[in-house]
Regions:
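Residue cluster at the C-terminal edge of the helix-turn-helix DNA-binding motif
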Residues: 41, 58-61, 120
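Extreme N-terminal segment that seeds HTH/winged-HTH DNA-binding domains in transcriptional regulators
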Residues: 1-31, 37, 87, 91-123
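Beta-hairpin "wing" of winged helix-turn-helix
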Residues: 25-26, 30, 58-67, 71-74
């Protein structure tokens, strides 16, 4: 795994696991790799993956069955989407709106472009 400098490694690993959950690589109720397995997979120290798993547990995305392993929570996907929606609305959307304003792009033009995007990429 290639890591970026602008975010903690444990959070990048947690984001990757969230992506895998959203892609159904790890469906709700299914066991995810052990800490050691995942550490070997992404080539980091096991303590880093421990922090990732702790963060995912705090967000109620995964849970631990003591002595058995970590599992995707039944509502794990919902929690991931809620976290990402909040991050989008609080962090990304204000920057996007600022860019629209400074470039003089109208809401109508965005609406047109969004409709084109949907028809091109999602309505095949």
């Amino acid at each position: 795994m290639i890591f970026r400098d602008n975010q903690s490694i444990y959070l990048q690993i947690a984001e990757r696991i969230c992506d895998e959950i959203l892609e159904n690589k790890f469906p709700p109720g299914e066991r995810i790799p052990s800490i050691r397995e995942y550490a070997a997979l992404v080539e980091v120290n096991a303590n880093t993956v421990v922090r990732s798993y702790e963060w995912l547990q705090q967000q109620e995305i995964i849970f631990n069955k003591r002595g058995i392993g970590y599992y995707v929570s039944p509502e794990g996907k919902h929690h991931i989407k809620a976290i990402r929606r909040e991050r989008f609305f609080n962090d990304e959307l204000p920057l996007f709106f600022n860019r629209l304003y400074t470039l003089g792009i109208s809401v109508e033009e965005i609406d047109t472009r969004y409709a084109e995007y949907l028809s091109k990429y999602l309505n095949k």
